[in-house]
Amino acid sequence: MMEERKSAPVMRRVVLAAAALMLCAAALVCALLYVNATTLRGTVSRTALTLTTPDELGAAAELWSAETAHGVLKLRGALARRGIGAVDLRVGLIWKPDGGAEEDAVTLLNTQMVRVDTAGMGVQDADDHCGFVAAVKLKRLPHRGENGQYRAVLVSEGQLIDGGALGLTLRRQGESWTVEGGSR
């Protein structure tokens, strides 16, 4: 009987230590997922891409929300295309310094495809897996401290989908940011 009393506190400590370890592991996984979700996915040269517009693709591009909160830019929208299936779609940003020309490099954001209702987008038989959610931590964007603006574009399967499709401009003045425009 005396041994049972001694083992109960030991068991309690083991259970508490295991619970604390599980909480630490869960916090680490959440932190890694956040870092991954807000990391850039590289750059690509505009000259390596074929320039096109949503109209030329028989598609409709919309940006539903663009916001900066807690140092993270989040974009939600869709590129509705007819019967496409799986797509490699990325949101890209093109930098233009104040008083200068747009750069050739397109900075690609981490972009996740999501299902959306395409009924009101004007494309018949559009694939419902055409929505996107993109995010980036603003301090990870190039051109820190420079004044200028980023313009949002879509990059899909070797094509730069532009023509003001998204209508989003992200202005930078020193370390402050302003989101302007958007198609909806």
Model-found features: residue ranges?
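N-terminal Lys/Arg-rich, disordered targeting/topogenic segments
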Residues: 1-11
